[in-house]
Amino acid sequence: MLECRVTKTKISIVRYLNAAPLAWGILEGQQSGDFQPVMSTPSECADQLANGSVDIGLIPSIEFQRIKGSKIIGGPVVSSRHRVRSVLLISNKPLWEVKTVACDSGSRTSVAL
């Protein structure tokens, strides 16, 4: 008797609100049963795609250039026509007095900006 295993495509999904419409389509859409979702931060999604622990990843555009052999799958994206204020610099002192800035390691795009 032959044993046939069907493996699901592992996909790393950003667990942030701005990616919710894409995540919903993957998790609840017509092909939802085809995927094994992994909920992650944007930087974790990129790392998982780069190290091969997932097959597909919703990654920040800035990460695409550093992942060798990656290809863009056409379709919907997370974008905006206007300012979204996702990166804020907040300080208790004037900007010229700021010597260091703490950044969220979960989003390398925010750090790059």
Specify the residue positions occupied by each region the protein language model found:
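Domain-level signature for soluble enzymes in the chorismate/prephenate branch of the shikimate pathway
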Residues: 2-113
